[in-house]
Amino acid sequence: MPTIIIETFINAPAERCFDLARDIGLHCQTTSKTKERAVAGVTSGLIELGQSVTFEAVHFGVRQRLTSQIVEYDRSKLFVDEMTKGIFASMCHVHEFETQDKSTLMRDTVTWKSPLGIWGIIADALFLKRYMAKFISERGVSLKDIAENEKQ
């Protein structure tokens, strides 16, 4: 199963970064390139342990839906969402927030299993792993910019 790890250093407290990362409206704002929007479950505000959200987005020209649930939660330090329905055979996204002085190291670890057997494995190697890394990295940069520059 492919895994990507993206680390983003943010000059803001971990609690602020943690809450921004859980904000459903902000998630949609920071993924606007894929026309992402929350269509079911928690569709606004901060998602909590046990809650789920369904996002609809356009990836590779195809409109898709992905539902994930928060399965682990440690306030200001970590939350984990797992796909419960969507295009992947499985997907898990671990969001970690490590305080460093007065700043935060935000670490996103995403692991997935693509569908379609060998074809999914080939897609992972040819383009999907790179696409996922870019998608998560760009969202991290957007969260960093908001955390460091906007009052929310």
Predicted segments with their positions:
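Generic structural detector for well-ordered beta-strands
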Residues: 5-11, 56, 69, 96-98, ...
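Beta-strand/loop substructures that line and gate deep hydrophobic ligand-binding cavities in soluble
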Residues: 80-134
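Short, surface-exposed coil-to-beta transition loops
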Residues: 3-5, 63-67, 90-93
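Beta-strand elements of well-folded, non-transmembrane domains
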Residues: 10-12, 59-61, 72, 87, ...
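Hydrophobic ligand-binding cavity/cleft-lining segments
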Residues: 1-43, 48
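Glycine-rich portal/gate segments that line the openings of hydrophobic small-molecule binding cavities
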Residues: 38-85, 105, 138-151
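Short strand-connecting beta-turns/loops that link adjacent beta-strands
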Residues: 13, 75-76, 100-103
